[in-house]
Amino acid sequence: MIGEGGSGGALALGVADRVLMLANSVYSVITVEGCAAILWKDGKSPEMRERAATALKITAQDLIEHHVVDEVIPEPPGGAHVDHEATARAVQEALLKHVDELRRLKPDKLVRRRREKFLKIGAVQE
C-alpha cells in the first residue's frame, strides 16, 4: 500500500500472499470521513475523523499488529513524497525479498499459508 486505500476495492489488494505497506500509509474498508458520517453523522469535524481513524485501526502499525499487513516499509525522513528515489529503493528491496521467498514455495504450501494468514487477521474484544 502506498498513500491511502479506503474502500472495499482497496481491500481487494489484500488478497495476496504478502501485503506490504509504506509506514505513513493508511488502509481500511472505508474512509475515516465515511465512517464518521455513518456512525456519528459527522464526517467533517477533525474530532470525529480522528475518532473514526482510531476505531478503524488504519495505520501501518495497527495493521501489522492485527496481521493484515506483513511488512511495513520505512519511509525517508519527511515521508515518501520527499525522496522518491529512496522510497523506490526501499519498495524494490522489500518486493524482491518477498518475491524471492515466495517463489521458492510449492503451490500447495502457498495456498495453505495464505489460508492460515487470513484466519489470523483481526482482533476480538470481549
Regions found by a protein language model. Name each.
Residues 85-126:
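Intrinsically disordered, low-complexity segments enriched in small/flexible residues
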